[in-house]
């Protein structure tokens, strides 16, 4: 499968099955887009019409580009076949129905009102609710009972905002720690948080019990505060950044990462990555927004 996109003036072609990334000019970008569904003659005609008047785009140049594409295909670097497709249905069979990870939705609610939230402010288009300790405990028992001979088990504490169910989070981690040795298991917990409820107790707990912490920040203050707001419409940047910096500093090199979302409002999101790096954060991830195509935040060709 080939993905094509434009970023910061570059034409990028990603061949996902080989992992090859190509940075190409406009002509090659267009030819690659047409390559699988058009004959060489049709490509020459369409490209010649589009770039009429350009002295560097003649029929020979177009045909040379087509030959270059053929060479990349032959080398397994473009339009590569998915060699794993036939195995996809056998993964469950080969795993022996073993479960090794669990995402616990401990808080079906949130204290932020982010405009682009795919989870509808943590409610997932339902009613606000918090997971009970009993349900969480049964989920951890289920994971252990169905993990077979696996020792390391991953549990993600998610929401909504999981710190809104703080007491249950602490009790569930305590329960897991109390039984993991006798069950021959090792729990690795990850917490995802928007940072609003972080305090010294949370920092100490996370740095003791969490194998990883995911901290939500969209980068520059003006970008973050355009969407990541509370229910009064106030931005969150000034309240969460000091807490994130304190947590990361106290973490002493343990795993964490800043998790940002880029939208139609910040196609220059590399500047948000640089901003977070300037704040002292070294583990960074920016992900595209997940929303309906007609949402104002949606990423479009515009």
Task: Set out the residue ranges of the language-model regions.
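A short small-residue
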Residues: 119-122, 221, 290-295
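Acidic, low-complexity/disordered tracts enriched in E/D and polar residues
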Residues: 1-35
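Radical SAM/AdoMet-radical enzyme domain recognition
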Residues: 136, 140-156, 165-291
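A C-terminal junction/extension of Radical SAM enzymes
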Residues: 61-62, 295-302
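Short acidic, hydrophobic short linear motifs in intrinsically disordered regions
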Residues: 38-54
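A short acidic, helix-capping loop that chelates divalent metal ions and anchors anionic groups
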Residues: 125-126, 223-228, 294-298
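Conserved alpha-helical substructure of the radical SAM core
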Residues: 57-72, 79-82, 86-204, 209
């Amino acid at each position: 499968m080939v993905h094509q996109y434009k970023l910061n003036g570059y034409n990028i072609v990603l061949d996902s099955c080989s992992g090859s990334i190509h940075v190409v000019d406009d002509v090659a970008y267009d030819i690659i887009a047409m390559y699988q569904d058009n004959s060489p003659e049709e490509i020459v005609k369409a490209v010649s019409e589009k770039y009429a008047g350009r002295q560097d785009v003649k029929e020979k140049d177009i045909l040379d580009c087509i030959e270059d594409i053929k060479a990349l295909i032959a080398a397994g670097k473009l339009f590569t076949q998915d060699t794993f497709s036939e195995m996809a249905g056998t993964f469950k069979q080969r795993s022996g129905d073993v479960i090794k990870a669990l995402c616990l939705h401990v808080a079906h609610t949130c204290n932020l009102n982010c405009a682009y939230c795919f989870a509808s402010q943590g409610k997932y288009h339902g009613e606000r609710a918090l997971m009970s300790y009993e349900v969480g405990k049964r989920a951890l028992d289920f994971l252990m009972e169905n993990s077979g001979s696996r020792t390391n088990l991953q549990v993600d504490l998610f929401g909504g905002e999981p710190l809104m169910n703080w007491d249950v989070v602490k009790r569930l981690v305590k329960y897991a720690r109390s039984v993991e040795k006798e069950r021959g298991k090792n729990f690795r917990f990850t917490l995802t948080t928007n940072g609003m409820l972080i305090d010294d107790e949370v920092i100490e707990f996370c740095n003791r019990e969490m194998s990883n912490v995911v901290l939500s920040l969209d980068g520059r203050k003006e970008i973050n505060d355009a969407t990541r707001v509370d229910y009064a419409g106030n931005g969150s940047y000034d309240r969460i950044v000091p807490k994130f910096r304190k947590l990361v500093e106290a973490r002493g090199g343990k795993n964490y990462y800043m998790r940002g979302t880029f939208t139609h409002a910040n196609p220059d999101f590399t500047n948000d990555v640089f901003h977070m790096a300037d704040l002292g954060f070294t583990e960074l991830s920016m992900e595209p927004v997940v929303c309906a195509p007609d949402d104002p935040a949606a990423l479009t060709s515009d």
